C-alpha cells in the first residue's frame, strides 16, 4: 500500500513538473532541476527554476541590486523587510511551482498566487517603517537606458503606501498575488508550502477560487500532521 502511494506520488509530481515547466523570465531555466549549491532560496534547491549563481546576488545583506533593479532607492531595507522581499524574489525566480500561476498574456509573469493572510500581515509588520517610492514594483519606476529603476515619486513609509498587509500583497507586485481565504491552501514561502502545493495542484486553475471544503479539510489535516512531525524533529535535535 505504501509502495503504491509512493509510486502514485512520483507519477503526480513528474506529470505536474512536465505540465508547468518554468516561467519565461530572463533568468529562468526551461525546466526545474536540482541546484545543490544554492546560496539562498534553498527552499527550492531540490527542484529549482533558477541557477545557483542567480542566488549569489541575494546572499549578502544589505542587498543593493537584483538583476537590474535596485532595492535601496529609498534607503537600505531593514533586515526583516529584506528577508520578506527575498522570499518573494526566490519564489518568482526559483520555485518550480510558480508556473502553475503563469499569466497567459505575459509568460514571464504570475497572477493570483494565493498567499496566506498571516504571511502578508507579518510581511507588512516587517516593512511598515521602511520606505519605498513605487506602489507597484513592476510598473511604477522610471527605467533608464540600461533598464535600471529610479524613483518617479517621493519616498514614503510602507505604512503610508499600503493600508495593511492585504493591500500590500495585492498591490506591490501588480496582479501577481492575492490573499487567500483559506489558512491552509495558501503559500507562506516556507516548508509548509509543500502541503499547500499538493492540494492546490490537484485543483485546476479555473476552480481555484472556489476551492472545495473537502480539499480545505484535507489540507488542514495534513498541515497539523506536518507541524507535529516538524516539532518532533526539532525535539530530537535538541
Ligand atoms: C549561471 O549558470 C548557468 C549554468 O551553469 C550559466 O548558463 C549562466 O550563464 C550563469 N549566469 C551567470 C550570470 O553567470
Ligand atoms: C485593508 O485595506 C483595504 C484597502 O484600504 C481595506 O479595504 C480593508 O478593509 C483593510 N483590511 C483590514 C483587515 O483592515
Curated annotation (Swiss-Prot):
Report where it is expressed, by tissue.
Answer: Yolk RBP is synthesized in the liver; egg-white RBP is synthesized in the oviduct.
Q: Does the keyword S-adenosyl-L-methionine apply?
A: no
Magnesium recorded as keyword: no
In Pfam terms, one family for this protein is: Folate_rec
Q: Record's InterPro entries?
A: Folate_rcpt (IPR004269), Folate_rcpt-like (IPR018143)
Kindly list the cysteine pairs connected by disulfide bridges.
22-49, 41-90, 50-94, 74-155, 81-127, 116-186, 120-169, 133-151, 184-219
Q: Which residues are glycosylated?
A: 53, 164
Task: Report the superkingdom from the record.
Answer: Eukaryota
GO cellular component, alphabetical, reads: external side of plasma membrane
Post-translational modification as stated in the protein's UniProt record? Plasma and yolk RBPS have the same carbohydrate components, whereas egg-white RBP has a different, ovomucoid-type carbohydrate chain. Plasma RBP has the same C-terminal sequence as the egg-white RBP, which suggests that the C-terminal residues are cleaved off upon incorporation into the oocyte.
Summarizing the annotation, the consequence of altering residue 31 to K is: In 30% of egg-white and yolk
Signal peptide stretch: 1-17
Residues where Phosphoserine occurs? Answer: 204-205, 208-210, 212-214
GO MF term list: riboflavin binding; riboflavin transmembrane transporter activity; signaling receptor activity
- Chain positions found as Pyrrolidone carboxylic acid: 18
Residue ranges spanning the membrane: these are none
UniProt keywords (A-Z) are: Disulfide bond, Glycoprotein, Phosphoprotein, Pyrrolidone carboxylic acid, Signal, Transport
Q: What's its job?
A: Required for the transport of riboflavin to the developing oocyte.
Task: State the similarity comment.
Answer: Belongs to the folate receptor family.
The name on file for this protein is: Riboflavin-binding protein
* Species in which this protein is naturally found: Gallus gallus (Chicken)
